[in-house]
């Protein structure tokens, strides 16, 4: 999922600007939230949001997520797989299929 070329390009971008000093986990988490709100704003008045605008905001969210993972020294692919395993246990396919019910009500 995470291409090393993307990771290396992000690292180079940050290094060229000497921005690593600002990339604390707290600041990166805040930036994820801010960019996620901007992504949501694309859908605020129209469920059929402009794909270009959504793509730009989604890229911002993903960029900050990857930067945070890098800052924390965690592998984004592995943490997604680990979380997916936990979610599988909470939402067994035979009980959750086609339902939006929360896991504790299945």
What do the PLM-derived regions correspond to, one by one?
Residues 1-106:
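Flexible "arm" and connector segments at domain edges
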């Amino acid at each position: 999922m995470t291409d090393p070329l993307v990771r290396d390009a992000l690292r180079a971008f940050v290094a060229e600007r000497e921005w690593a000093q600002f990339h604390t986990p707290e600041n990166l988490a805040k930036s994820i939230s801010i960019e996620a709100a901007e992504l949501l704003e694309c859908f605020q008045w129209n469920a059929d949001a402009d794909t270009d605008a959504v793509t730009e905001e989604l890229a911002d969210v993903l960029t900050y997520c990857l930067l945070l993972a890098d800052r924390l020294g965690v592998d984004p692919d592995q943490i997604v797989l680990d979380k997916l395993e936990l979610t599988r246990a909470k939402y067994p396919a035979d009980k959750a299929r086609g339902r939006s019910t929360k896991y504790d009500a299945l």
